[in-house]
Swiss-Prot record:
Recorded GO MF terms: translation elongation factor activity
Its job: Involved in peptide bond synthesis. Stimulates efficient translation and peptide-bond synthesis on native or reconstituted 70S ribosomes in vitro. Probably functions indirectly by altering the affinity of the ribosome for aminoacyl-tRNA, thus increasing their reactivity as acceptors for peptidyl transferase.
Chief location category: cytoplasm
GO-annotated biological processes: peptide biosynthetic process
UniProt keyword annotation of Ligase present: no
Source organism, top-level taxon: Bacteria
Lineage of the species this protein comes from: Bacteria, Pseudomonadati, Elusimicrobiota, Elusimicrobia, Elusimicrobiales
Gene name per UniProt: efp
SUPFAM superfamilies: Nucleic acid-binding proteins, Translation proteins SH3-like domain
Protein name: Elongation factor P
Family per record: Belongs to the elongation factor P family.
Organism: Elusimicrobium minutum (strain Pei191)
Length: 186
């Protein structure tokens, strides 16, 4: 059993609803007359969706034993995404609906991690930062490099994000897959 004092980013545990979750971010809060609470941003493994919640310091949770294996995304066909285990070279097909948030960033030959619980593939974890190409955006105007204004741009995977005005069509950008945000030009 683990408690909120054991919390750290990347810790995987079973929450009060029986869901297996990973800690993305956490903060301990204490107000003068109130009890302390721990605010946590969690990623639900299996669906990839995020949820924010609070726990009391005395709350206990069941720790989950997870094995991480290196994977490579190969291709999507129909409603399945195909990955290859880089150690055994076995191919695994994962339903696209199980990759709810991850599929927005999948490009061929992308390195990722397969999470195994009880020797069964439970989730695919993408790298935090990925390099993607801008498919379309309105052109920038000379002198826009000083401003911090943004414009919308569509990536090669179809995702629309906000980028600085100096980014043009065909540029490669680094994206943060956790927050779906632009980081920098590649």
């Amino acid at each position: 059993m683990i408690s909120t004092t054991d919390f750290k980013e990347g810790l995987i545990f079973e929450n009060e609803n029986g869901e297996i979750v990973e800690i993305v971010d956490y903060q301990h809060h204490r107000k003068s007359q109130a009890r302390a609470v721990v605010r946590v941003k969690l990623r639900k493994l299996g669906s990839g969706s995020y949820v924010e919640t609070s726990y009391r310091p005395e709350d206990k949770f069941k720790e989950v034993s997870v094995e991480k294996r290196p994977f490579m995304y190969l291709y999507s066909e129909g409603d399945m995404a195909h990955f290859m285990n880089n150690e055994s070279y076995d191919q695994v097909a994962v339903p696209l609906d199980k990759l709810e948030n991850q599929r927005k960033y999948l490009i061929e030959n992308m390195e990722c991690t397969g999470l195994y619980i009880n020797d069964q593939l439970f989730d695919i974890v993408l790298p935090i930062k990925v390099v993607l190409t801008i498919k379309s955006t309105v052109p920038g105007v000379k002198g826009d490099t000083v401003s911090n204004l943004t414009k919308e741009a569509e990536l090669e995977t179809g995702v629309t994000i906000k980028v600085p005005l100096f980014i043009n069509e065909g540029d490669k950008v680094i994206m943060d897959t956790r927050y779906c945000t632009y980081v920098e030009r590649a």
